[in-house]
Amino acid sequence: MYPQGRHPAPQTPGQPGFKFTVAESCDRIKDEFQFLQAQYHSLKVEYIKLANEKTEMQRHYIMYYEMSYGLNIEMHKQTEIAKRLNAILAQIMPFLSQEHQQQVAQAVERAKQVTMTELNAIIGVRGLPNLPLTQQLQAQHLSHTHGPVALTPPHPSGLQPPGIPPVTGSGSGLLALGALGSQPHLPAKDEKNHHDLEHRESTNNSISPSDSLRTTSEKHRGSSDYSLDSKKRKVEDKDSMSRYDSDGDKSDDLVVDVSNEDPATPRGSPAHSPPENGIDKPRPAKKDTPRRPASVASSGSTPSSKTKPPEHNDKSSTPGLKSKAPTPRNDAPTPGTSTTPGLRPILGKPPMEALAAPALRTPLTCPTPFAMMSHHEMNGSLTNPGVYAGLHISPQMSAAAAAAYGRSPMAGFEPPHMRAPGLPASLTSISGGKPAYSFHVSADGQMQPVPFPPDALIGPGIPRHARQINTLSHGEVVCAVTISNPTRHVYTGGKGCVKIWDISQPGSKSPVSQLDCLNRDNYIRSCKLLPDGRTLIVGGEASTLTIWDLASQTPRIKAELTSSAPACYALAISPDAKVCFSCCSDGNIAVWDLHNQTLVRQFQGHTDGASCIDISHDGTKLWTGGLDNTVRSWDLREGRQLQQHDFASQIFSLGYCPTGEWLAVGMESSNVEVLHHTKPDKYQLHLHESCVLSLKFAYCGKWFVSTGKDNLLNAWSTPYGASIFQSKESSSVLSCDISADDKYIVTGSGDKKATVYEVIY
């Protein structure tokens, strides 16, 4: 069928050679593959080794970071003690005779002259007087680990060795680091385990990264103390969490407040703050900062604590409100929380109980100078909550850092990825190493720390501090407070009622009257007295405003004003008491004629709930802040919007200075910004560590107060924000008011009470 030529041709002499070439090529490819595989294996081993070394370096970094915190806390504490002792000496010296005064003065001056040699002798650095400070520290640290003293070569001028913070001033804080490193009593068991660890690491290059994540103290434990099994480590993490309790209920117990250790200072009374744009002593830690790295893993990974988006939430006692990120769930009971079901959702500001509950943050949301950090998840390798699971620092390391988690007193200790977003490293501290908390922001966005004048905290009308004189147990989360004029009665708004307290009677523990308004399960968000003190207007999570007649023998409802919005977040009264302005959850500003009890106008502009409001002293201009990240001003004579200021954060509170010019704005981002009503310049203040929930100017206009979810009450000078005093309460501070004579401050908080402070001048 097919031609003969189609049959297979006879083999040619070259064909066997072709077969040999294919086999040889296959062998060659196989050899090359094996070579590449060996090379790959070698590189993989090297990679794992480098990963282990990196993890080890990060672990050491965390240890040094904790030590730095503790030592700086101790340094500032000792500095404050020295200042107080100097003040006592200065007060006592005039009682001495002239001759003794001179002798004592000379002795005091001699005591202040501490040389480097004496410091080295005190902390046990002998024989190394001429070495640079960082090399002395390394020498001491290596000496107690029984390793050779391998000093690093000097670094180029102006540069610091990695992992060692820059030394500012006399460096006394880091000199103490050497004292810690030179402790001679390393336990024998630790020494043995240390050498065992070195042997294991040198003989096993492919040790898994998870093993190397164990910290020094974990490796020093006996083999019965832990297992490599990940399930058991999760159990240990859970135990660690139970030791530290939840962020919700017991985190206040973990606050380290060295400023209140003086027994002469009453609980709750604020410590005096220096006029510098920085601190002389640490301020109280907030509850949503990590207590210590040991609790990093057990804190859990939670989203940044923004408020809920609008949704049906049958488990919250207050309706869910719109924001940009979900509120993390907190299973632990918190002050002021309730599980009343069946409440309808309302758009707008965060729920009161969400604000009252302690904030939950991502682990390692670093405690920083005056909350200049991002309150969201940080960038960088340290944010993974699983990286340092079960991280425990050895007793030698953690002893000095027990009180470490207040605000960082020295900004130089923060790595670049842990600084405030948008805040250059050069701005986080000023001369002397003190962290700046007040910044001037120019029209082009340039930020500079504010140099406070010498009389920043001195002068008529500037208070020295405030002391707590009364606690009013309301029984529910206090979302609104106001003080009568003259100062006699305090009005506290909670869930479904306003209670009236007579603070002119010392020790009064019960209200003189209770005004039931709105629905029983709805929170009062604002209550305002008319200037005559005879009428109270109440607004909250309902569509009606209630007008109370207080002049009658028994307070009674005089009228109700109904709007189309489901909630009112804030109220303002015109100086002539003829008009009431209400911030509505739909973003509108309702204008009410109080005489005719009618709605006369609505200002429309906010695209989300209007959260806060204030009116100028002459009654011609209105300022409003909203959850749409804007602050707007309105001309009340012409009924139009004048200005709009855009921010990167939701606006929770604002106040307009009674003397004009300045507007202070409290934000969800924890900043307070002070704006000029005509100039583009502004001041940015960084003492709060969570959202700023309320703000109020003193009637003299020289100072104002702000309160926050971080439990803090801060008093600031106008306009540049020198810190006058600070008080820490036991829960989120949701509302505040100042009496007309500027002598009293009242705050409402999430632990179901209001606190009355007397302002001391």
Curated annotation (Swiss-Prot):
Composition bias, Basic and acidic residues: 187-202, 216-253, 278-291
Ranges of compositional bias, category Low complexity: 173-182, 293-307
Role description: Transcriptional corepressor that binds to a number of transcription factors. Inhibits the transcriptional activation mediated by CTNNB1 and TCF family members in Wnt signaling. The effects of full-length TLE family members may be modulated by association with dominant-negative AES.
Region annotation (SP domain) ranges: 275-441
CDD domains, alphabetized: WD40 (cd00200)
Organism: Danio rerio
Name of the protein in question: Transducin-like enhancer protein 3-A
PTM annotation, UniProt: Ubiquitinated by XIAP/BIRC4.
Cellular location(s): Nucleus
Annotated spans, GP domain: 141-204
Organismal lineage: Eukaryota, Metazoa, Chordata, Craniata, Vertebrata
Superkingdom of source: Eukaryota
A GO biological process held by the record: negative regulation of canonical Wnt signaling pathway
Gene3D superfamilies from the UniProt entry: YVTN repeat-like/Quinoprotein amine dehydrogenase
Tissue expression pattern: Expressed ubiquitously during gastrulation. Expressed in the entire presomitic mesoderm, including the tailbud, throughout somitogenesis. Also expressed diffusely within whole somites in young stages. In older stages, expression is restricted to boundaries between somites. Also expressed in a dynamic manner within the neural plate.
Pfam families the UniProt entry points to: TLE_N (PF03920), WD40 (PF00400)
